[in-house]
């Protein structure tokens, strides 16, 4: 089972990927995590990535794709994998296709997490996190008993920079610019499957499992 998850920040890709890894016993692969792991382990591509990172420069596609290739060649990917948040562009999708071809693999399904941007913004902008214990709250959907105070430990609740409305709007704009062509690309490959990501976590999970198993069947 070789999957790609597409969706805007906050759509629940990571949560669903984590649940699927337990169901199907395949690894969840996040580019941010494997980039950090490659740098820490000093793999050939990790060493190259660190050179760019030390200069404060963006890690180029060629290196990112190389790190993804290193990860996909690992033994635990033999039965499948879930790519979470990669590829982000058509150029990366083309490179991924070549990498997988060289490994004798191919993408089976690209799951697109469909969300209403207004609802998504409300979800994310309302998040609050405890500085002390890390527990998460939501000002509307899961408010603390006392405004600004953690129910669990009494710590201060704050809004992360990534959850601020101006930041989220910029991230969503970038996502739309990059991903609209990518969705068209995968539609052309007949791999794109859409799920309603605004439903409860368990319902989204059922959608994905049903979709994957029906397509496999």
Swiss-Prot record:
PANTHER family attached to this UniProt entry: NUCLEOTIDE KINASE
Organism: Geobacter sulfurreducens (strain ATCC 51573 / DSM 12127 / PCA)
Name of this protein: Adenylate kinase
Designated gene of the protein: adk
Record's catalysed reaction(s): AMP + ATP = 2 ADP
Residue segments, region LID: 126-163
EC id: 2.7.4.3
Binding site for ATP: 10-15, 127, 199
Entry keywords, A to Z: ATP-binding, Cytoplasm, Kinase, Metal-binding, Nucleotide biosynthesis, Nucleotide-binding, Transferase, Zinc
């Amino acid at each position: 089972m070789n999957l790609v998850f597409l969706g805007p920040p906050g759509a629940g890709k990571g949560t669903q990927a984590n649940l699927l890894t337990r169901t199907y016993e395949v690894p969840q692969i996040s580019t941010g995590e494997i980039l950090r792991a490659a740098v820490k382990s000093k793999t050939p591509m990790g060493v190259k990535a660190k050179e760019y990172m030390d200069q404060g420069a963006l890690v180029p596609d060629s290196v990112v794709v190389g790190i993804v290739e290193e990860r996909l060649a690992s033994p635990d990917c033999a039965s499948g994998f879930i790519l979470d948040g990669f590829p982000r562009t058509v150029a990366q999708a083309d490179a991924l296709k070549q990498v997988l071809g060289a490994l004798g693999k191919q993408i089976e399904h690209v799951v697109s997490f469909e969300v209403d941007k207004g609802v998504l913004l409300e979800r994310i902008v309302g998040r609050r996190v405890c500085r002390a214990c890390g527990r998460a709250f939501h000002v509307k959907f899961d408010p603390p008993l006392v405004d600004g105070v953690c129910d669990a430990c009494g710590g201060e609740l704050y809004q992360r920079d990534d959850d601020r409305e101006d930041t989220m709007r910029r991230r969503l704009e970038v996502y739309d610019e990059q991903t609209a062509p990518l969705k068209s690309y995968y539609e052309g490959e007949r791999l794109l499957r859409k799920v309603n990501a605004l439903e409860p976590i368990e319902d989204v999970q059922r959608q994905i499992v049903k979709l994957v198993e029906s397509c496999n069947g």
